[in-house]
């Protein structure tokens, strides 16, 4: 997943142009809650920020995802990963995402936008029947409140917008201007200490779960 290996040289010029065109369209007119991060030197390395949907345990989080195009794309689906740690039935320990769109339901005319929207939908409606994280799948089916609490806690620890710099909406997070810092420096230090203490406590709770 973290490999620097690229398949650019194995993709046809037509496929590269098609992918680049779609990414640029998404950058100009982004889907709600999704911000694509274009790597112009390697179109096979596609990353995006997805806002956690409201009303889910992932709300208020920002999740970085990665799509890896193989040499046979679009005849074969890309692999998809969460780079941000997440507690979800359809996400493996290494971040790999399991969704039918990227397996038996794949069609060559499904684009990057469709894949990212499908991943966002997976945050709203997980599929515990095809779980890669069996613990999360079982917990969702049998003890939803515990599942929701665990997923929320992971979101608060690992998916805070400050870790990504911006949210998928494009708004800067925790980026105070010089004048703000001048007047609020002490308050910010106190808040940071409180946040750090809270995160440590949550991590201890996670270990006990």
From Swiss-Prot:
GO terms for biological process: anaphase-promoting complex-dependent catabolic process; cell division; exit from mitosis; protein ubiquitination. It catalyses: S-ubiquitinyl-[E1 ubiquitin-activating enzyme]-L-cysteine + [E2 ubiquitin-conjugating enzyme]-L-cysteine = [E1 ubiquitin-activating enzyme]-L-cysteine + S-ubiquitinyl-[E2 ubiquitin-conjugating enzyme]-L-cysteine. Residues 164-209 are annotated as: Disordered. Gene3D superfamilies: Ubiquitin Conjugating Enzyme. Residues 200-209 have a biased composition (Basic residues). The active site is at 98 (glycyl thioester intermediate). Pathway: Protein modification; protein ubiquitination. InterPro entries: Ub_conjugating_enzyme, UBQ-conjugat_E2_core, UBQ-conjugating_AS, UBQ-conjugating_enzyme/RWD. Residues 171-199 have a biased composition (Basic and acidic residues). Residues 14-160 form the UBC core domain. It is an enzyme of class 2 (transferase). Keywords: ATP-binding, Cell cycle, Cell division, Nucleotide-binding, Transferase, Ubl conjugation pathway. Belongs to the ubiquitin-conjugating enzyme family. Catalyzes the covalent attachment of ubiquitin to other proteins. Acts as an essential factor of the anaphase promoting complex/cyclosome (APC/C), a cell cycle-regulated ubiquitin ligase that controls progression through mitosis. Acts by specifically elongating polyubiquitin chains initiated by the E2 enzyme vih/UbcH10 on APC/C substrates, enhancing the degradation of APC/C substrates by the proteasome and promoting mitotic exit. This is Ubiquitin-conjugating enzyme E2 S. It comes from Drosophila yakuba (Fruit fly).
